[in-house]
Amino acid sequence: MSPGGPPEGEKKRKSIKEISPIDVYKLLPRTNCAECGEANCMAFATRLVNGELLLADCPPLFTPEYQASHEKLDRLLAPPVRTVTIGTGSNAINIGGKYVLQRHDFTYHNPTPIAIDVHDLMPEAELLDRIRQIEGFSYNYIGRTLTLNAICVRSVSGDATTFGNAVRTVIRASHYPLILCTLDPAVMAAGLAEAKEHRPLIYAATESNWKEMADLALAHKAPLAVFAPNDLALLRSLVKTLLSCGIQDLVLDPGTFVEEGLPDTIANFTAIRAAACKQFDELFGFPLLGVPLTVWTGTELSDDVLKWRETLTASVLLSRYADLLIMHSLDGWVLLPQLIWRFNLYTDPRKPVSVEAGVRTFGRPRSEEH
């Protein structure tokens, strides 16, 4: 068992595949009150284990009489990878919440949101135009509308006022959830001052700035990304420290390396997710952030080559457990493969993809006399 697994003598946690409806039923009120909409508590337990219902669908569980049972069910059914919410209200996105390493073992929840970057040195007209492109990008696929999901605001200037102004402009122009990207706590504070009601993702806490970033995350009740490039031991250490500070909503970035570094990236993402889902390592039980955008910071090549590499990197990270992606390109041939692959990856393998049944008219049928 890894250092993040259960202590010696503690009962090993069950995976979602090992939890039976009986395990859940024993902790339910067992009154068959039907407030959940099911005929009895056993039917509710069965659908709960299958991920079709939530504990919140059982009102009696939230009364003082059943508080102990509610807490036990929370622990029993909690996913090994925590769910983290970015944004607020109807515009919020959930990332993580994974139960299994391999999709076919159960199903994947919370399809990977794709964020597109903007930066604080863009002229306002260019910034607003890019926001319109991000929000306007959509594609109809098998009756579903596929879209982008978030905006990442990067500090290129390194200036707090400039960054704050850019964040303000984005908030006024867009309803999308935000990722604020700077390693300078003073610059981040300016961005958070503009986005304090929007619960953005703070990117990122590192070995050198974790204390200041932790204070900002606590003050603004915002999720915090943890960045330790190609150093899983440091990543675990930072997570442990931040948890001890009282921060529960963390997102892990082990670094996105391209070209010769891509195998290391795949290995790191896989190791983290395997530790969480197979060994129940709580320090690695957080959503993973992939940044295909990094292809634009490497070797200077033609735009088409860089876009192709970004496409490749994004597809690989989607396949290897990334719960959130930050990208740069807005070309259809770069984004559509990600949106379509995401849709197919996050379909429930227990339920075939289908379209609404019905009779449809094609053309103009003529009467027999014609």
Model-derived features with residue positions:
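Immediate flanking context of iron-sulfur cluster ligation sites
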Residues: 18-35, 50
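Local cysteine-cluster metal-coordination motifs and their immediate loop/turn environment
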Residues: 29-47, 56-60
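Active-site beta->alpha loop and helix N-cap motifs at the rims of alpha/beta catalytic domains
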Residues: 77-236
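Active-site glycine- and acidic-residue-rich loops that bind
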Residues: 227-235, 256-271, 305-308
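C-terminal helical cap(s) of enzyme catalytic domains, especially alpha/beta-barrels
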Residues: 265-269, 331-352
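Active-site-adjacent loop and "lid" segments of alpha/beta metabolic enzymes
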Residues: 282-323, 327, 339-341
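Conserved small/polar residues in nucleotide/adenosyl-binding loops
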Residues: 369-370
